[in-house]
Amino acid sequence: MEKNEFKFTIYFYFLPLMVVCLSHNLNSKMHRDNMRNIAFLLGSTLFLTTQVQADLVINGQSVAVNTTEQKILDLNASNNFQMCIANLKTQAMNSGVSSSTFDRYTQNLTPDYSVIEKLNYQPEFSTPIWDYLSGLVDIERIELGKQKIQQHRDVLNKVSATYGVPAETVVAVWGVESNYGSISGKNDLLQSLGTLSCEGRRQSFFRGEFFAAMRILQRGDLTQDQLKGSWAGAFGHTQFMPSTYEELAVDFDGDGRRDLVSSTTDALASTANFLKKRGWQTGQPWGFEVKVPEGFSISGESRRNKKSLSSWVERGVVRADGSPIIQANLAESSQAGLMSPAGENGPLFLVFKNFDAIYSYNAAESYALAIAHLSDRLQGASGFVKEWPTNDAGTSRTERREIQAYLLSRGYSIGDVDGLIGDKTRQAIRQEQMHFGLSPTGRAGQLILRAIRDQNAKKMMK
């Protein structure tokens, strides 16, 4: 922060107080006292400004401000948040939230600004596709998913019969969203959604979710303690947003409540209902990997630019194993788009309307591909035929835990060995990549894993 910037900040906070003093009956007997108050405030302001400037500039460089400024900034941020929340009351009431409900759940609400940072970093948009998929569709998740299918076979059979969505697809959503219910989020939804309603981008969207969360509590579907989830407001086994819950959640176990938190049955059925309502076509595939003839141009092709399978056949497109693309329940008139998530040198896919239904769950092609691929693997299919165009492929969660264990042994403070790559792990990886002479990308890829294994092997031989 520059000197002048902070001087303006101090004046900004104290000027209203000075104006109040000036405007308070200047002709009264208190005039003289008011002027003394103003002089005191001006002196305090100048003192604070000078004091903070001395702290801010050391050797010509900006450093951390003192606690006085921080307290002022924190107070102002808190006041701004409370003012924003109060201004939302009319809008909330127009959406069906009662005055008493709004007051009850907002009177002690405080902001959580960490969610703003997460809003600006979403791995499905910023992580290389091979990293994203390797962590979500690994042997560990595949095997556990198969166990879950067997464990919930009766319920899944009923769900599939009711909604026409395969058990493997429903369970794949469950696996990607919460690792089959084991990681559903610990954020207080009202705090997260309240903050996102007043800060950052997409405030209008998050306000709708904020009000929906209060309506859920108002109806008594869930308690506030149960309404915990992701930083963005998704909750339960299959991570529904509050408005999606209101629209599509179902009471499949017949207990009179739509419970995506404690009832696996309700969660699985609600997920199938979601996909059905978003256009899932029973008996049709989501898509499949294909290969194209040499010289084939993918320019202009996309998931949205769908064409008949007969037109793709005419252009020489076949399945990745070389077999014809028109098989089973597919017709020449079936519509599919060509998707190339890593460009022409990576795997290519023809995708149908069922892929779009999955995509609507979370609008990212990498996310939809993770669920689609996991559903195939749960049915016994193998991995993609064509490799991703990288010399540093992604790692599984087991391999990521191996990397984290090594980093801990090197003295890095990165938290638990859980296979989840956060900022601290990425920073530590960058340091080790430089140590090994690798490009400091911060990625938990195969190159750093091999370097670690080589290092450990050398230690074992000594």
What do the PLM-derived regions correspond to, one by one?
Residues 35-109, 410, 434, 450-462:
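N-terminal secretory targeting signals
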Residues 11-13, 24, 31:
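Low-complexity, intrinsically disordered or signal/transmembrane-proximal segments
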Residues 395-400, 408-452:
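Short acidic, glycine/serine/threonine-rich helix-capping segments at coil-helix boundaries
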Residues 5-8, 30-39:
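Bacterial N-terminal signal peptides that target proteins for export
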Residues 6-14, 47:
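Aromatic (phenylalanine/tyrosine) cluster motif
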Residues 97-333, 346-351, 355-375, 379-397, ...:
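Catalytic glycan-binding domains that act on GlcNAc-containing polysaccharides
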